[in-house]
Amino acid sequence: MLITDTLSPQAFEEALRAKGDFYHIHHPYHIAMHNGNATREQIQGWVANRFYYQTTIPLKDAAIMANCPDAQTRRKWVQRILDHDGSHGEDGGIEAWLRLGEAVGLSRDDLLSERHVLPGVRFAVDAYLNFARRACWQEAACSSLTELFAPQIHQSRLDSWPQHYPWIKEEGYFYFRSRLSQANRDVEHGLALAKAYCDSAEKQNRMLEILQFKLDILWSMLDAMTMAYALQRPPYHTVTDKAAWHTTRLV
């Protein structure tokens, strides 16, 4: 979609929401998890790799705040960091994800060590963080608008996983429940920023491209997991049966 004349705020929001057709809820890997066709290894691999994304989110949000001169925006945006890191003695989303890891049979060290993070996942997530560091704060903030589609994917896991995967412990689902309300709150703020900032056809086109970039990141993460856990072709599988890839955050 190429915008030639500036869209009204409502029409621009509709264009943003239309990008949901490319959300990773439609990826074959996620469809398999939803339908109960994923193996234990595939569920564990997803949880372990997605943890790298989870731990990068507060770094991304801190980068946005560092580039944002507006105190009112920073006061709102900081809540996203607190949601993941925790505050006032309450655990945040990262701790909740660690409990999800334990619920699917992984140890906390399995996740914290990052040894299961595939290179393709790491590259995709690092690209997101680097974009947030280098882009203007408005564009970086609006790259988070995949949150438009997040409540649906969290609810789909709550609806299907307990039925299909009774071996997953109930306490592992807290993260998905907590994000249902948090994501809706974040969407409201993010949409308001996007509609206020994108006041020309040029800016609207660029923001749609940025949202597609974020969708590409999420889709590419699942492509990497498909190669490793569905097709049994992890990196270097033709030369070794060991995990030979780098396992530390270098960026």
UniProtKB/Swiss-Prot annotation:
Keywords: Oxidoreductase, PQQ biosynthesis. Pathway: Cofactor biosynthesis; pyrroloquinoline quinone biosynthesis. One of its GO terms (molecular function) is pyrroloquinoline-quinone synthase activity. Its EC number is 1.3.3.11. One of its GO terms (biological process) is pyrroloquinoline quinone biosynthetic process. Belongs to the PqqC family. This is Pyrroloquinoline-quinone synthase. It comes from Klebsiella pneumoniae subsp. pneumoniae (strain ATCC 700721 / MGH 78578).
